[in-house]
Amino acid sequence: FVELARKGFYDGLKFHRHVPGFVIQGGCPNTRDLTPEEVVKKAGNPFAGLGTGGPGYSIKEEFSTNPNNKHLDGSLAMARSQDPNSAGSQFYLCLGAQPMLDSGYTVFGQTIDGMDVIGQLRVGDVIESVEIENAAE
């Protein structure tokens, strides 16, 4: 995530999934060339290709080796397919604590300020840029 963010991978992508009280998800490169309105229109169609894109590689899961893997309100975590080792570029922010995800999805960040902004994010909203602070290398 940090490497992709520093390369500008996320710049201009749109959030493509919002489940109130659960998560807001982004990071799918298939949203890059779509307008926000097109993303909103396609978001309800499971065959539209949203949520299926990635950076061309996948990341091994880390939730099984991280005792602090807790999905709290504002946690930043890697989205993936059914394969635990399939995470790539897609991420989600928790909209409330989601402990049922702790044993299956890797948390790698925590929102420390701006939860009011996260709560207002919706499908089609544009990721202008991602700024990394205090990242472990």
Predicted segment positions?
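Cyclophilin-like peptidyl-prolyl cis-trans isomerases
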Residues: 2-137
